[in-house]
């Protein structure tokens, strides 16, 4: 019994002590007053020393922009927090424009000039302009044509280099000249031209020799009874162009190419060989 009484008395004393304790129920109030009193006694040095630990989260961006002169920390506008949005777009556009400017000429060059045009609803190919030859080039081409109507590839390249023309231009000129020459011969305007040894026509081998063609410039031609007058439809202009055909092959060998003066002086003993 004595122990029970002592326990009860001790518990009652503890409850009384806890109830009468001035610190437990007023701990929050006393703590606030204590810390507020101490906060008033802090020095400015302690206040600024503890300030960086609580303020960098909210004031660090404002201090950064204050250095650039964009305004105070309190007047900073929310729209200027995104300066890289529009600037990035303009920067992309700035680098995009030169690329587009470079691509534009390429697209223009890729478009070829139209070589076909519509005439009466039908496509017609545009012909290239004709080549205009100078008088020097025409004279040189004419002299070469009188020597040979067909040119080998090295000869054509050499002639084109001498005259300042392309091989295609020389080739086309010779083709046109040959067709014109054949047309004149068929019309009878240039007689005896097919007998030239330079011509590659097979008809020249079957035609008889005509000695009056080779010595038309000699004075004995007027007294030659075998000389035949030229046809009336012959054109003097064409004869002047082809005049070298008549006398330049005299240096070639062959009995049918010799002038008539040399043919009459053959020795009489040559018939004994047969």
UniProtKB/Swiss-Prot annotation:
One GO MF annotation is: RNA polymerase II cis-regulatory region sequence-specific DNA binding
User: What is the similarity comment for this entry?
Assistant: Belongs to the distal-less homeobox family.
As for subcellular location, the record says: Nucleus
Instruction: Indicate what this protein is called per its UniProt record.
Output: Distal-less-like protein DLX-3
Q: Which InterPro entries match?
A: Distal-less_Homeobox_TF, Distal-less_N, HD, HD_metazoa, Homeobox_CS, Homeodomain-like_sf, HTH_motif
The UniProt keywords, alphabetically, are: Developmental protein, DNA-binding, Homeobox, Nucleus
Instruction: Write down the SMART domains for this protein, in alphabetical order.
Output: HOX
Q: What spans are recorded as compositionally biased (Low complexity)?
A: 259-274
Ranges for the region named Disordered are 189-274
Residues annotated to bind DNA? 126-185
What biological-process terms (Gene Ontology) are attached? epithelial cell differentiation
Q: Where along the chain is composition biased (Polar residues)?
A: 199-220
GO CC terms for this protein?
Answer: nucleus
Instruction: Using the record, list the residue span of the signal peptide; answer none if the entry has no such feature.
Output: none
């Amino acid at each position: 019994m004595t122990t029970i009484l002592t326990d009860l008395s001790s518990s009652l004393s503890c409850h009384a002590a806890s109830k009468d304790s001035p610190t437990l129920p007023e701990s929050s109030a006393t703590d606030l007053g204590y810390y507020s009193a101490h906060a008033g006694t802090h020095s400015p040095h302690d206040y600024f020393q503890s300030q960086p630990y609580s303020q960098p989260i909210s004031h660090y961006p404002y201090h950064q922009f204050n250095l650039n002169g964009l305004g105070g920390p309190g007047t900073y506008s929310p729209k200027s927090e995104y300066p890289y949005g529009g600037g990035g777009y303009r920067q992309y556009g700035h680098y995009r424009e030169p690329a587009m400017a470079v691509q534009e000429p390429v697209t223009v060059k890729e478009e070829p000039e139209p070589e076909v045009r519509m005439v009466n609803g039908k496509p017609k190919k545009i012909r290239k302009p004709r080549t205009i030859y100078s008088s020097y080039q025409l004279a040189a081409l004419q002299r070469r044509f009188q020597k040979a109507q067909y040119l080998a590839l090295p000869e054509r390249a050499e002639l084109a280099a001498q005259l300042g023309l392309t091989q295609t231009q020389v080739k086309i000129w010779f083709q046109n000249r040959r067709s014109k020459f054949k047309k004149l011969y068929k019309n009878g305007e240039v007689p005896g031209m097919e007998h030239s040894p330079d011509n590659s026509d097979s008809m020249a081998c079957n035609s008889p020799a005509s000695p009056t063609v080779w010595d038309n410039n000699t004075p004995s031609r007027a007294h030659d009874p075998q000389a035949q007058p030229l046809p009336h439809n012959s054109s003097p202009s064409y004869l002047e162009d082809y005049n070298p055909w008549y006398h330049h092959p005299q240096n070639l060998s062959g009995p049918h190419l010799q002038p008539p003066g040399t043919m009459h002086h053959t020795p009489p003993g040559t018939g004994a060989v047969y």
